[in-house]
Regions:
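Residues in and immediately flanking transmembrane alpha helices
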Residues: 15-16, 45, 76, 398, ...
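Hydrophobic alpha-helical segments, especially transmembrane helices
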Residues: 3-4, 33-34, 334
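Short, surface-exposed loop/turn motifs that are enriched in glycine and acidic residues
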Residues: 8, 132-133, 416-417
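GH16 jelly-roll
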Residues: 257-501
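Short, flexible active-site-adjacent loop segments at beta-strand->alpha-helix junctions, enriched
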Residues: 9-10, 35, 66, 78-79, ...
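Phosphate-group recognition and catalysis centered on beta-loop-alpha active-site segments
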Residues: 19-260
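Bacterial Sec-dependent N-terminal signal peptides
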Residues: 1-23
Length: 501
């Protein structure tokens, strides 16, 4: 009996010592063709794979083709240095060398290299054959055979632009993680066909609540190929599962910056992806032309595309020289009142400002129910104001009964901004029960603290709503007159997002 127990114990120790212990990276970064760009490594090389591992990427994506003599090799394009991969032998390919001295990797060599670590997944893309569908299925079969032969199943996830290849992978490996790339198949259909994820171009997700709906079905959502900061931040804000990028180093930096990384959750947003008039589910209009308490000169129109229109992914609020009632200018003032009202949170707006003396663009918030009485008793938060006669200067301001511009006690600060008329900047506040912080491009430049002395100091314990407008003239904006040569003049808004904790 004692001998049996000792033998069993030794078998357990032996088995445990050879058991795989994985520690897959828990982030959203998939290096597209490996991490090649920053260090000028060849794409789809062993060097780019190892760099992705070194960076700590969740995955390193690579592409599989088959030579004329049946060897599986790694390359993105159908040609490798002038040779059509599917029409030449592997030995023909060996006559060519990558810029770092590597030969074209075989799938076997790539998997063996990938298996040396247990932190970064290998994202295997099966390329559609240019010769025949049947050949593509053969590539799929042989890829699975190689993965199984090398016992690399735990490392590998699969993607393809051919839906039949995806289904073939699942027929051979029912537990494999498989995602489809092309973009035309619904999340519901992929779920029914037992795919585990969707991997579409990021533009597909910018409508119809794609990300949220797919995730509700239990599908992972990956976006390709995302190399610019605005798209990265949009996807991160919407909690996409993975992002495939040529810029993994940049994406890691953006992940650190995103509000989501600071514990914020996106509650409401308008990304302005639907061309035409602004969405009525999100926005109403303040309409009229009687000065708006500031002796402004414009008439704010109601759903007039000359003054408020979405095109090319931006909301354009345009002030123009046009007669309306007793006014000689028209513009627009959009509000989320009674469509999205909120108390506390982070509001961020990415915008490019109009240039010209006499303009007064603003991104701000007013109380929805005026809990403590009319202005200024119930408060005002000016996230961004700019007056055209003071170029490149942007203001953040708070108004209350005790602190307001009428009695010259308002609390605010101006900050110089580089190229506000030709580049987009992110204007934001973070509003808590004890303070309001103001930011431009993540630089905090003002804090207004709750003194806890009552609503005269702090009326900011009630619902507010967002306002976007471009005024003309006014006591502040028109202090040095209006230059009629500047019209039309538009504030372009890329997005409005509100986060809460």
């Amino acid at each position: 009996m004692k001998r049996v127990l000792i033998s069993a114990l030794m078998l357990f120790i032996f088995t445990a010592s050879f058991a795989q212990k994985f520690n897959w990276n828990k982030n959203q970064v998939i290096a597209h063709r490996g991490a090649w760009k920053k260090n000028n490594f060849p794409q789809n090389s062993i060097a780019s794979l190892n760099e992705a591992v070194k960076l700590g990427c969740y995955g390193s994506e690579f592409d599989v083709w088959m030579t004329a003599d049946g060897v599986l090799v790694i390359n993105h394009d159908p040609e490798f240095q002038g040779l059509t991969i599917e029409k030449v032998s592997y030995n023909d390919l060996l006559t060519k060398t990558m810029t770092n001295g590597e030969k074209i990797p075989t799938l076997e060599a790539y998997l063996l290299e990938g298996k040396k670590q247990k932190t970064t997944k290998l994202i295997l893309e099966i390329k559609p054959s240019l010769i025949s569908k049947e050949r593509g299925i053969e590539v799929t079969n042989k890829s699975i055979e190689m993965v199984q032969k090398l016992r690399a199943t735990d490392w590998v996830e699969y993607i393809s632009f051919d839906y039949d290849y995806c289904k073939r992978v699942l027929a051979l490996l029912p537990k494999a993680k498989v995602a489809y790339l092309r973009g035309e198949i619904s999340a519901e259909q992929m779920k029914a066909d037992k795919l585990t994820g969707v991997d579409y171009h990021y533009s597909v997700y910018q409508k119809d609540n794609w990300i949220e709906n797919a995730q509700k079905l239990g599908l992972t959502v990956n976006a390709w190929t995302v190399n610019a900061v605005p798209e990265m931040q949009w996807l991160l804000a919407h909690k996409v599962d993975y992002i495939t990028t040529n810029e993994p180093e940049l994406l890691f930096e953006e992940i650190k910056k995103t509000p989501v990384a600071q514990g914020w959750k996106l509650k409401w947003a308008d990304e302005f992806d639907d061309a035409g008039l602004p969405l009525t589910k999100n926005w109403s209009y303040d309409v009229g032309g009687k000065g708006w308490g500031n002796n402004e000169l414009q008439y704010y129109t109601d759903a007039d595309s000359a003054n408020a229109v979405v095109k090319k992914g931006n909301l354009n609020i345009t002030a123009i020289k046009a007669d309306k009632d007793a006014n000689h200018y028209t513009s627009a003032r959009l509000v989320t009142k009674n469509k999205f009202d909120f108390k506390y949170g982070r509001v961020e707006v990415r915008a490019m400002l109009p240039k010209g003396r006499g303009l007064w663009p603003a991104i701000w918030a007013l109380p929805t129910d005026w809990k403590y009485g009319n202005w200024p008793k119930s408060g005002e938060i000016d996230i961004m104001e700019h007056v055209g006669y003071d170029p490149d200067s942007v203001h953040g301001t708070v108004h209350t009964e005790k602190f307001n511009h009428v009695i010259k006690t308002q609390v605010g600060k101006a900050l110089k901004v580089n190229n506000p008329y030709t580049e987009y900047h992110v204007y934001a506040i973070e509003w808590f029960a004890d303070r309001i912080d103001f930011f431009i491009d993540d630089q905090k430049y003002l804090t207004f603290n709750n003194t806890k002395k009552g609503s005269g100091d702090w009326p900011f314990d009630q619902n507010f709503h967002v306002i976007l407008n471009v005024a003309v003239g006014g006591g502040w904006g028109g202090k040095k007159g209006v230059d009629d040569a500047i019209f039309p003049a538009a504030m372009k808004v890329d997005y409005v997002r509100v986060f809460q904790k």
